Swiss-Prot record:
Its EC number is 3.5.3.6. GO terms for biological process: arginine catabolic process to ornithine; arginine deiminase pathway. Keywords: Arginine metabolism, Cytoplasm, Hydrolase. It comes from Bacillus cereus (strain AH820). This is Arginine deiminase.
Length: 410
């Protein structure tokens, strides 16, 4: 097998992708805890699974190998000590390591098979799953006060964010929100211990222990030499700067990092919710991220005089900055919703800008964003629509739901 991770663009033919099928974690959402768990609504599990299966099969029909996070994680934990270590870390990071409850929960979780263990951790552990006789603390007995020992992880079907493939390596990300912080631990163990990856010594350009957050929805691989990263509600400028320094000092292909500042709000959560690449010279964009004259804050980061310095150049036009770093004389920014103020806001909320390119000029989108899809087709893009009534409730689209592992070079 060649190197197991290889992504040098957003649009190269997709060969291998990582998904997570929605599971019990979705059914453990309740209205009282939606905000805490970063959801706006509760998807209906049978339908969201059906829609996700349709999405996965759509990719397979185009020759894409589909891997599942939950399966890889279970396969990585073959060693008994490794299982115990993983459970300890999950409980600690999930703040379920309070007093004796830690040991009780650990014994409970380790009683399951690997597959069941992973599903249980992802789905959450409720207080009523532990025998009352084993509960020694007041908070354990108060199920109505808070029902979980270990919170569910309903955002896991957005595999884009906890880690991102960059060249032949990846970033394993520190997630900004506590509800998602544990998610990248799965990828850490998969890369270190799954036989598909472990023997290849995959470079980690930035790991989850770095103190400032970065998320994969903000990381876009424009070409072999250039990546774009959103400075957003979820990704900090300090993390981008550290990643740029690490890349410039540890490899020689990526030469520029484009830091793109976007409004810090839930609707514009990551760069890929407002901006994606669909062809060599075509991008989707939500017009609301630009100022009245199309102005934005964009910074081109390049290697400085030594490993700890950067050359930083400020630009105010996204189009001009893209033309500069991609060496293009012309390019097209396709507005989400066709620029209509109502359609644009509605379709961006339902991830009209969150396209997944599976080849140059070929994208997967949600069927509900018909204005944006029509406009993409008018620009010569092949649009493959997938079902979206329940998937879209999590506020993420096809790009959010997929982590490319291998793409062909363009």
């Amino acid at each position: 097998m060649k190197h197991p991770i290889h992504v040098t663009s957003e649009i190269g033919e997709l060969q291998t992708v990582l998904l997570k099928r929605p599971g019990k974690e979705v059914e453990n959402l309740t209205p009282d805890y939606l905000q805490q768990l970063l959801f706006d609504d509760i998807p209906y599990l049978p339908i969201i699974q059906k829609e996700h299966d349709y999405f996965a099969q759509t990719l397979r029909n185009r020759g894409v190998e589909v891997l599942y996070l939950e399966k890889l994680a279970a396969e990585a934990l073959v060693d008994k000590k490794l299982r115990e270590e993983f459970v300890d870390r999950i409980l600690k990071e999930g703040q379920a390591d309070v007093n004796v409850a830690h040991q009780t929960l650990k014994e409970y979780l380790l009683s399951f098979s690997n597959e069941e263990l992973i599903q249980k951790i992802m789905g959450g552990v409720r207080k009523n799953e532990i025998e009352t006789s084993k509960k020694t603390h007041l908070y354990e007995l108060m199920e109505d006060h808070y029902p979980f020992y270990l919170d569910p992880m309903p955002n896991l079907y957005f595999t884009r964010d906890p880690a991102a493939s960059v060249g032949d390596g990846l970033t394993i990300n520190k997630m900004r929100e506590p509800a998602r912080r544990r998610e990248s631990l799965f990828m850490e163990y998969i890369i270190k211990y799954h036989p598909r990856f472990a023997k290849h010594n995959v470079p980690i350009w930035l790991d989850r222990d770095y103190k400032f957050p970065i998320e994969g929805g903000d990381e876009l691989i424009l070409n072999e030499e250039t990546i774009a990263i959103g400075v957003s509600a979820r990704t900090s400028a300090k993390a981008i700067e550290r990643l740029a320094k690490n890349l410039f000092s540890r490899q020689n292909k990526i030469k520029k990092v484009l830091a793109i500042e976007i409004p810090k709000c839930r609707a514009f959560m990551h760069l890929d919710t407002v901006f994606t690449m669909v062809d060599y010279d075509k991008f989707t964009i939500h017009p609301a991220i630009q100022g009245p004259k199309g102005n934005m804050n964009i910074y081109i980061l390049e290697k400085g005089a030594d490993e700890e310095t950067l050359k930083i150049t400020h630009r105010t036009s996204l189009m001009e900055a893209l033309k500069e770093v991609l060496d293009l004389s012309e390019l097209v920014l396709i507005p989400c919703g066709g620029g209509d103020v109502i359609a644009s806001a509605r379709e961006q909320w339902n991830d009209g800008s969150n396209t997944l390119a599976i080849a140059p000029g070929v994208v997967v989108t949600y069927d509900r964003n018909y204005v944006s899809n029509t406009l993409l087709r008018e620009h010569g893009i092949e649009v493959i629509e997938v079902l979206s009534s329940e998937l879209s409730r999590g506020r993420g689209g096809p790009r959010c739901m997929s982590m490319p592992i291998v793409r062909k070079d363009i």
